[in-house]
Regions:
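Membrane-embedded catalytic cores of phosphoryl/pyrophosphoryl-handling enzymes
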Residues: 60-173
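Hydrophobic alpha-helical bundle signature of multipass membrane enzymes
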Residues: 1-71, 87-94, 107
Length: 173
């Protein structure tokens, strides 16, 4: 089960999720939001692999464990899960009606981020500090991207959530 959970933070799963969300945003003519989501996740990916190259920390040596060929610090699964799921969670809160639904989306994003990170330690491919660093850097990057998105929305450079220019009247509300 831990390997199933850890796969939720894999590049394959995150790329499919990114493609699905961006496809949806483009269909409802939220090009600015789509660009911000892509920029957030691609930026997080570049930062993650840049930090791996900088620190080049070896992984834990577990006989018979999962073979991984990149450096250990920081955990890309933990970092990119934080960036992706927290960004999408906040995106959903911008269109969700009611505090309960907003709390659900943020709670789900945090839960996924935490269990994916913990699974990396459990399966023996990271030290706890790798995961903690991934969570911290990923959360900080996601927060910075949210601030940029809010400023761009206030300036009118990115469309406000909840409005749609789709001809058939489809809205994301």
């Amino acid at each position: 089960m831990a390997r199933d959970v850890t796969s939720l933070g894999s590049m394959v799963v995150l790329c499919f999720l990114l493609a699905a969300v961006v496809g949806y945003l483009l269909l409802v003519r939220k090009r600015g939001a789509a660009l911000l989501v892509v920029g957030s996740i691609l930026g997080g990916t570049v930062i993650s692999f840049g930090l791996k190259l900088l620190f080049n920390r070896p992984r834990p040596e577990i006989p018979g464990g999962i073979q991984v060929f990149t450096a250990s610090f920081p955990s890309s699964h933990a970092m990119l899960s934080a960036v992706t799921y927290l960004t999408l969670g906040v995106l959903m809160t911008r269109v969700a009606a009611g505090a309960r639904l907003k709390a659900y989306f943020i709670g789900l994003a945090v839960f996924l981020t935490v269990v994916i990170g913990l699974s990396r330690v459990y399966v023996g491919v990271h030290y706890a500090t790798d995961v903690l660093a991934g969570w911290c850097v990923g959360s900080a990057w996601a927060a910075l991207c949210w601030v940029v998105a809010l400023r761009l929305q206030r300036r009118g450079q990115v469309e406000q959530p909840g409005t749609s220019d789709v001809p058939d009247g489809t809205s994301i509300e």
